[in-house]
């Protein structure tokens, strides 16, 4: 397998395992801070914490019945990575189209795979989290497989306090 294909396979595999356990495994609510919720769970004997939020506004051409729920996540793994930023769009992204992560006009490209997207490095994750701490709104702009532009807007109200909850529990 060539490196790029292997990388894509690994991302898909681990994201499926991680998010299926996060969403369907036993999770404990650590707290709710305005528009953000903080959770903890065990994943392969490792404690994993995450904060998540749903959009306050969605626009674009799509059939609501065919779209899953969109979320933004920031994840910490005890003894592992901290502040990993990801999104779940609720639709598959069009291949070779960037996903835009926009905090109050500061735009960053995310790497899409199926219905998820991540930054390309932990350095970019740190930048995104800093922007989210200081920001008011987060806008995710993506293109669906049929080519429709979809925009989800999230409030960052409560983000910093929710992040502190997972930092305390899973750093």
Where are these regions (language model features)?
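Bacterial N-terminal signal peptides that target proteins for export
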Residues: 1-11
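Hydrophobic alpha-helical segments
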Residues: 12-13, 159
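Conserved nucleotide-sugar donor-binding subdomain of glycosyltransferases
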Residues: 17
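A generic "folded-domain core" signal
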Residues: 24-171
């Amino acid at each position: 397998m060539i490196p790029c294909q292997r990388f894509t396979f690994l991302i898909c595999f681990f994201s499926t395992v991680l998010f299926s356990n996060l969403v369907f495994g036993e999770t404990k609510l650590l707290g709710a801070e305005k528009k953000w919720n903080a959770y903890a769970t065990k994943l392969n004997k490792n404690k994993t914490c995450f904060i998540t939020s749903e959009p306050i506004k969605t626009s674009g051409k799509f059939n609501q019945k065919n779209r899953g729920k969109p979320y933004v996540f920031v994840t910490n793994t005890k003894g592992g990575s901290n502040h990993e930023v990801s999104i779940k769009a609720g639709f598959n992204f069009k291949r070779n189209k960037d996903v835009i992560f926009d905090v109050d006009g500061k735009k960053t490209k995310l790497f899409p795979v199926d219905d998820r997207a991540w930054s390309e490095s932990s350095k970019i994750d740190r930048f995104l989290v800093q922007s989210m701490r200081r920001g008011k709104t987060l806008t995710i702009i993506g293109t669906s497989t049929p080519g429709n532009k979809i925009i989800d807007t999230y409030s960052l109200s409560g983000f910093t306090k929710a992040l502190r909850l997972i930092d305390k529990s899973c750093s």
